[in-house]
């Protein structure tokens, strides 16, 4: 699928970083796909070969449906599943990027040319704890306005499971009390002074927006301590599967994606639904992009 990760707010989806791809179709045709102007792609589409026939069909689809796609296709960018229809209405059409969301239904990618990104010089974390999970989602737009590199959510279930594992006791010591949700906000920077300014700006904005936290924010500049925080976040999925008994969190609401401004509505609705069935759910992952893993 069109995967990405914690830093998608900086780097986008896989498709956003694909320059070109060599693909193989079910009929045996093997060829290179990449970006091009309408004239360039039309010229290639006039060739009587596998690539030409594919491009002719894609360009015909684009001409017929681009207005409908632009008008009615959901605008939120953080989708890893389903065909990337918005590729058809971008200023420069790149057919190779359609393969990133096709899950093998278009063909097989044999090789790809992709963009590279610079590894950050320094990073910092600000850990924010909330008494209510919905409150953490409501706070996310304010945090996002401070231009972090990532905002990751950990919920009470994940925290409780991690605390129960002796191997993670020291890594999770940064969490105080029993918060319903914890947001780990990461910043990139060239110097420690720059990182401190960014962290201070975030704290100022939280105070100005009157966002209620369950405890004081924690600023983490030390690389080892940051690694401990991320180790707790990454351990979550495996620990969810370690729950004993017949009832376990399962991925039935996976990769749910909506604009950050409305994500709290989804969380509130799911919380009410699972409570109605006297159950619970795990919520974690990419708050910054409006994309959570929700496992009742």
List each language-model region with its residue ranges.
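FAD-binding subdomain of flavoenzyme oxidoreductases
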Residues: 1-140
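C-terminal substrate-recognition/cap domain of FAD-linked oxidoreductases
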Residues: 87-92, 96-296
